[in-house]
A protein has these predicted regions:
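A short glycine/serine-rich beta->alpha loop
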Residues: 29-34, 138-142, 224-229, 260-262, ...
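Flexible, glycine-rich loop/tail regions that form catalytic "lids" or insertion modules at the edges
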Residues: 62, 274-277, 281-447
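Catalytic alpha/beta active-site cores
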Residues: 1-180, 185-186, 204, 213-217, ...
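Generic secondary-structure signature for well-ordered alpha-helical cores
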Residues: 19-23, 50-54, 111-123, 151-165, ...
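Glycine-centered flexibility sites
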Residues: 2-5, 132, 137-139, 164, ...
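Alpha-helix initiation/capping motif
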Residues: 22, 77, 88, 102, ...
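Active-site capping/gating regions of soluble enzymes
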Residues: 147-156, 175-355
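Conserved active-site and cofactor/substrate-binding residues in soluble primary-metabolism enzymes
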Residues: 9-12, 36, 40, 44, ...
Length: 447
């Protein structure tokens, strides 16, 4: 069952999670932080949304839709759902080491998702969130975070183009996800990313204006949260949120102060949300976009960071591009070096961190706060397992054929996501994963 995130093993779990939410409402947008099994989880979500609209049809008409009506409901649902699935398998290898399928197979299925989105006019859902956040959390400095993330993004573009997709058919389905820390480079991270992306998309790929626009989400730095004097974490988060707003991020997540040690509480989440609300509704300067634009430090930093990122691109190219660099563990090695540098400076005091290595309370116990660690109970875990077994029993007569078809599609190089959309109706996450292991290969972790 696990302890991190929500346990979603079946379509029933997905429906229960979103019960009460209209998944096709313009005001509903769902972001799913899932990577290795992202295609399967995404298929469950899409089916949950379709089934929800079918249930609405039954409620209004008092009958099940016929085949033509069901097809229309499915088409309308896919065109309406809004959200993001993370799915970035490149950063998963570089920064987290938690892939489940082979990298090549994972890239192929990512392309299948985008191809399915293009064919079914899924225009409001991002097929991937190209993520630098995890790279930063693993230890990378802001330059490496931005360079690795953008190079990963261009790798996806090249992979999709190689499959025959037109750049303007998929570029709008790509989004980015960055961390904002305390270093000065974070102040211009968004504007540098947009400058590099727009230039490449226009002049290298011939993309239209919409495709040149880089859309990105910012989450304040989890690594900057400390267990010592946790109340100070809100101050750090506020500063990081402020520069994110000044840099015109498209969306923002502010961390709760107690995430340094546990799942946040209702109180800490409310405080984190208040940070955004106060900036947006009370802080006067926030009404103006690009408040810092034109200042010497912003313009200078923008040019310096862009040059540093382009130099990192050259180093990656010298190693055969992103995939070639991954084979020699270039990105992972650089992340480890920068993480070690950060930790050494933190422990030596060269990098001052208030309440951690300087400005310490006279009584060290003053900074210690008793916090309940939130974990799933054994009863909750057994309830989840019982639900899984019940779902598998109900679909047993159809699951075997669905899994066989899934493997056939994968072996023949057809669209795996299309098959997952059917398979998810009667098979669990584990069943589909095991079936794909046999034909797609299993990821072997590197140290």
């Amino acid at each position: 069952v696990g302890n991190s995130g929500v346990s979603i093993a079946t379509l029933d779990d997905m429906k229960e999670l979103y019960a009460g939410f209209d998944l096709c409402a313009p005001s509903t947008s769902v972001s799913m932080t899932i990577n290795g099994p992202a295609p399967t989880i995404l298929a469950m979500y899409m089916n949950a949304a379709i089934d929800q609209q079918v249930a609405n049809f039954v409620g209004v008409n008092g009958r099940e839709p016929n085949e033509e009506e069901h097809a229309a409901i499915k088409s309308q649902t896919l065109a309406s759902v809004r959200g993001t699935v993370q799915a970035d398998i490149l950063k998963e290898d570089q920064g987290q080491n938690t892939c489940i399928f082979s990298t090549e197979f994972s890239l192929k299925v990512m392309g299948d998702i985008q191809e399915y989105f293009t064919q079914h006019q899924v225009r409001n859902f991002y097929s991937v969130s190209i993520s630098g956040y995890h790279i930063a959390e693993a230890g990378a400095n802001p330059i490496s975070q931005l360079a690795f993330t953008l190079s990963n993004g261009f790798t996806f573009v090249e992979a999709y183009l190689a499959r025959g997709m037109a750049v303007d058919d998929f570029a709008h389905n790509l989004s980015f996800f960055f961390s904002n820390g305390m270093d000065p480079e974070y102040t211009v991270l968004g504007r540098v990313a947009r400058r590099i992306w727009a230039t490449a998309m226009r002049f290298r790929y011939g993309a239209n204006e919409r495709s040149q626009k880089l859309k990105y989400h910012i989450q304040t730095s989890g690594r900057s949260l400390h267990a010592q004097e946790m109340s100070f974490n809100d101050i750090r988060t506020t500063l990081q949120a402020l520069i994110a707003v000044y840099d015109n991020c498209n969306s923002l997540h502010t961390n709760a102060y107690d995430e340094a040690i546990t799942t946040p509480t209702e109180e800490s989440v409310r405080r984190a949300m208040a940070i955004q609300l106060i900036i947006n509704k009370e802080w006067g300067l926030a009404v103006n976009e690009n408040s810092n634009q034109g200042s010497f430090i912003i313009e200078e930093l923008t040019d310096l960071v862009e040059e540093a990122v382009l130099q990192e691109f050259e180093k990656i190219s010298e190693r055969g591009g992103v995939l070639g660099a991954m084979e020699v563990m270039y990105q992972r090695g650089k992340i480890q070096e920068e993480s070690m540098d950060y930790e050494m400076k933190k422990h030596s005091g060269e990098l001052p961190i208030i309440g951690v290595n300087t400005f310490l309370p006279k009584d060290q116990s003053e900074g210690v706060v008793e916090v309940e660690l939130i974990r799933a109970s054994d009863e909750e875990k057994h309830e989840q397992l019982d639900g899984l077994r019940d779902f598998q029993a109900r679909g047993a007569d159809r699951a075997s054929a669905a899994l066989t078809e899934l493997q056939r599609v994968a072996l023949n190089g057809e669209n795996v996501f299309s098959a997952l959309m059917e398979c998810a109706k009667v098979c669990s996450l584990g069943q589909m994963t095991e079936a794909l292991f046999e034909v797609g290969g299993q990821y072997r972790r590197n140290v």
